[in-house]
Every structure is written in structure tokens, then in C-alpha cells.
Amino acid sequence: MLELDLQLASDGQHPDEAQLRRWCELALRQRTADSELTIRLVDEEEGRELNRTWRHKDYATNVLSFPAEIPDGILDIPLLGDLVICVPVLEREAAEQGKTLEAHWAHLVIHGCLHLLGYDHIEEDEALEMEELERQLLAELGHPDPYAGDE
């Protein structure tokens, strides 16, 4: 079971909670434990402030992942972590990259959830593993390869 806390702090258009939940559940299906996570949708000002505070980068980014560092078993429902999605950045990227909003939303939610599971893309081999998993999950949803233009 996934307990999802959706926080809306942006006026931008966004998928409904059921759609966000579907993408999260797909990305998290390898996890057998119940999970709780928060998705906070923010504007550029808050996105920039969070990115500056936590990553020391002075710009708004598309998605930030904050994994919980609480061992399973302490809480009734294991807290997986928080995703912060900057809606204006997501919308701008989708337009610039020629992607549908739905496909880009799905990609960033899945990407963020994989980070909460411990996947990363700092080292090339880890990036290849994470990107391949993203491709597979998005293909299940009928969305194209989000990295097709990067090669």
C-alpha cells in the first residue's frame, strides 16, 4: 500500500492525485513494504530555494528527491521520502524537448521515486541502470524513451 501526501504550492497545471499515485506505484513495485511519500508541487521560487539550500545550486530544477533516513519498522508505515517537483520547470522542459506534458510528468515522478529507492546517476554505470529502468517503466505506460534525444 502506498500512502501519498500531495501538497500543492504551485498554480501550474498538474496531473490528479490518482495519476501521480499510478506512476509512483509503478516505480515502487519492486518495494514490498508499505510506503508513505510526499509529493510537493512548487513554483520556481520555492524550487530554487530548496535546490540552493540542499544542493548548493542557485536555480530551480525539475525534481528533487529527499529519501527518508528512518529504518523500516520504527513507524507504522515506512516513510520513503519526499519528492519536490517544480511545475514551471517541468512545463518549460517538456516544451523545449518536444515531449508531451503527461510523458514528462510520468518520467519525473518515476525518476524521483527511483531516487527514493536508492538509484542514482552520478556514476556512468549507475546512470545506465537507472535510465534503462526508467525506459522500461515508461514503455509500460506507452510513453517514448525520455533519453532518445540525448544520444
Curated annotation (Swiss-Prot):
Cofactor note: Binds 1 zinc ion.
Highest taxon above the source species: Bacteria
Matches recorded under Pfam families: YbeY
Subcellular location(s) of the protein: Cytoplasm
Species per Swiss-Prot/TrEMBL record: Ectopseudomonas mendocina (strain ymp) (Pseudomonas mendocina)
NCBIfam families, sorted: rRNA maturation RNase YbeY
Protein's recorded name: Endoribonuclease YbeY
Keywords noted in UniProt: Cytoplasm, Endonuclease, Hydrolase, Metal-binding, Nuclease, Ribosome biogenesis, rRNA processing, Zinc
GO biological process: rRNA processing
